[in-house]
């Protein structure tokens, strides 16, 4: 068999040989004790290897001078040096001179270069190498034993000075050794193997001596390996538990118990020795952990809460696929059991077969017991964990104030802790689909109720905890193959886990909480939610109240207007002209100017009915003279708020710029005045556009008002609603939008750019035939536009297109521009009713108008640019000897009417 072995085989062999080497070292120490050398409680790192050398990765095999080994620690080259020792700090007295010891030879550290030497074919060379190594080992061991004996004496003296038990020092070494990581111990064992294997003992003696002391080696045995982080060294300690038990009952002094014969002969005083703690970091960490444990224990004792621990494992035999999944965990060597290689360990060919047989038996005796598979674990603080057979966590419950209020998490059986469900202390939470779906949540529970969704996200069921019609009776959902969720109510939610004939049921909702906070907090949350709803309802109620007060105020103002109890102060003529001049300078369109609104408290002074009847004649006489036909635009819209004054003050001093509402503002009031009826009811034109009859039509058209205001008349028929229903709806909709928030629309719309009116052909107040039919030959569905008492437009097609809000607004603005340019129709102009064929010239003009309309914006905000283009076109047309008008055709889309200048 070749001496060159793989790295894995060497690693397994070193792991198996570690107990044997420790047994051999212990035997060597016993020999030293029998020879008169005191046995210390710990041995410093004999060969002074650094920590980096001990923990280096032996993954890359390199040739070695040891027969049958191939290993490398990866440590850097180390020069020849003497072993250095840690200086013990002095407290009060200086240290005594060290006892006589054999001269310290220079220790040749094994380097990587030395280990890479080739194997010698002759056995003589191997024997010489082994003998030299043994000599260096013996010389160094004697010196290190003496040094550690002196440290042990210091520890014993210090323990007596503070009144501690001398055995505590030994216990510290034993406890501190358990903190050493298993990999570090294995690497340290390998280091010891690489050095101790060079001794002069034969292979047969090595196996026999190791077998004789095999049972005494282990973590719980007196031999412990300790790493000192402060000095970066390893220590091999003997606890000597049997000797300590014998010396407890004796009344010998501390010097008799721990002073070796060698130091007694020298006469070193015990009180002059000082001790340095070999593991201060470990001791501080242990003390910190103990303090934390005691604090937690005191806290739980103060709460008087202590729950029994439940450590429940799977009883059934694990399936083969689960055993394969957990094979890595079962093969991992534990801290309290030595590694067991068993038959996997390969030994050199020179070893006898009987030794291998005995070694395998000892390894089987020290083998760890079969690892149990956890099922349900509960701890003192109330936390609970349920595990899958694979070892993954299935259910995790963490208590908050007590065990009755927990946070529950459900996980899938994969290593990545895939969350399936989450519930808070109140039982509110969500459950995810186990598979990838469009909607991740299958169940959602909140304080109001719950919902269940399908994979597409549609709500399948929805219920409320407090509703009488949507109360949940029971709900069971299989979260996965092992877990099932059962919901019987807001306070009854459980999770059942079943696997391998083992079942456990955990409560998710809050129950039996001794603190009594669950219901209060839930009630507070419900109250807070109710407060939010009440707050929203209060805001809505306040808004309704505000609107109601505004409506009532408008109603009261209407009554006051009818009674003539208040008057309104309008701006003077000078202020009005300045305001108009400023607006003309800024080139602001009249439609974009703010409209005058009459808020609560603003009213007008209306004369009594007798006074109005007596003065109506004079008013009507002045109306024709005050109706200008000038194309100059007069912008009289103001933004100044009106001031309310009492009736008495108005009578005492009435300024010429203060006037009451004219009777011509409202057609209804004007009609009642002309028919000598009671006008105290006032204007009622709040919802629909005012209806004008033949009684007041002529006087209403000639009443004094802003010349630029366009009066839009919609010709309707109350007996034929089908033909004029769309027109009525359009006029009423636009009228409501224009007069929104106004208490007296007919009075407050005096300064608007246009005003909407209706003319009913079938009204009983109309003449036979109606005045507009007799004068202009109008029909149902037409729209007439007047400005300054002159007819500007008439037809069914607006702005070249059909009947719509945008087209109506565009046609109104075009009529305003036509009036400013001086284009109007005669007062007695009659629209042709029969169908007519458009001439070629008329069709071209229609196409031109349509193309221009298409290029314009449909928005009312862009009408200004469109009107400017029309003005430029109209200015060119004024140079021609004829005037273009915009009348109506009944059946065709557009009918153009032209009149010669001489005829005009």
From Swiss-Prot:
The chain crosses the membrane at residues 778-798. It comes from the Eukaryota. It is found in: Membrane. Residues 342-360 have a biased composition (Polar residues). GO terms for cellular component: cytoplasm; membrane. Residues 247-275, 328-360 are annotated as: Disordered. It is a single-pass membrane protein. Keywords: Membrane, Transmembrane, Transmembrane helix. Pfam families: FAM194 (PF14977). This is Uncharacterized protein C3orf20. The lineage of its organism: Eukaryota, Metazoa, Chordata, Craniata, Vertebrata. The gene is C3orf20.
